[in-house]
Amino acid sequence: VVNTPGHAVSYHVY
């Protein structure tokens, strides 16, 4: 899952 721009919580999964 990549970071979601415009979302309340943007997260990165490595």
Swiss-Prot record:
It comes from the Eukaryota. The keyword Secreted applies. GO terms for biological process: neuropeptide signaling pathway. Keywords: Hormone, Neuropeptide, Secreted. GO terms for cellular component: extracellular region. The keyword Nuclease does not apply. It is found in: Secreted. GO terms for molecular function: neuropeptide hormone activity. To T.molitor cuticular protein LPCP29 C-terminal region. Strong inhibitor of fluid secretion by the Malpighian tubules. Uses cGMP as a second messenger and inhibits fluid production by decreasing cAMP concentration. Reduces isosmotic fluid secretion by inhibiting electroneutral and non-conductive transport pathways. Reverses the stimulatory effect of diuretic hormone I. This is Antidiuretic factor A.
